[in-house]
Amino acid sequence: MKISRRKVVVLGASAVSASLLPINLLAQSDGQSAEDIIKEFTGGANIGSGDIMLTTPEIAENGNTVPISVESKKATAIKILALGNPGPDVVTFKFGPLSATRSASTRIRLRKTQDVFAIAKLEDGSFIQDIQKVKVTIGGCGG
C-alpha cells in the first residue's frame, strides 16, 4: 500500500491540530454540587468542629501544585473539597483500625483563591471540619 505525500501532510497536520485542543478530563466536574458531595459523605449529619488540622499555605504562587496536609487522631475518613474548582471533590483519605497515624499529605490543584475544606468522619460516626483560605496568584485548573 502506497501512501502519498499529500496524505502524510494531511495526517501530520491533523495530529498537530488535535494535540492543541484543550483536554481537561481530570478537571471536569461530574455535575455534583459541593452541597451534594458533602451530604453524600456525611449522610446529612451535622458537621461540628474539633480535633482536625488542615495545613495549607496562605499564598500559593502556582495553583498547579498546592501542598496540603490534614490530620485527625480519631478519623476513619477525611474528605478534601476545593469549592472554587470546576470539580470540588478533591480526594478522600480512608484510614483502617491499624493505621499508625491518621494523617495525609498531597499536592492539589486550585483554580483561584478559595476556601479548602477538610471534613473528617470520626470513629463514633460524627463529623468535624476545618477550613483554610488559600490565595492563588496563578490558577491551576485551566481557568
What name fits each language-model region?
Residues M1-V16:
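N-terminal secretory signal peptides and thylakoid transit peptides that target proteins
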Residues A27-I59, D89-F93:
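Transition segment at domain starts
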Residues N64-I68:
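Structural beta-strand segments of beta-rich domains
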Residues S72-T76:
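Short proline/glycine-enriched turn/loop motifs at strand-loop junctions of beta-rich domains
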Residues P86-R109:
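An anionic, turn-rich surface loop/hairpin at beta-sheet edges
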Residues R111-D115:
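Extracellular Ig-like/FN3 beta-sandwich strand-entry sites
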Residues K133-G139:
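Short beta-strand edge segments in extracellular beta-sheet folds
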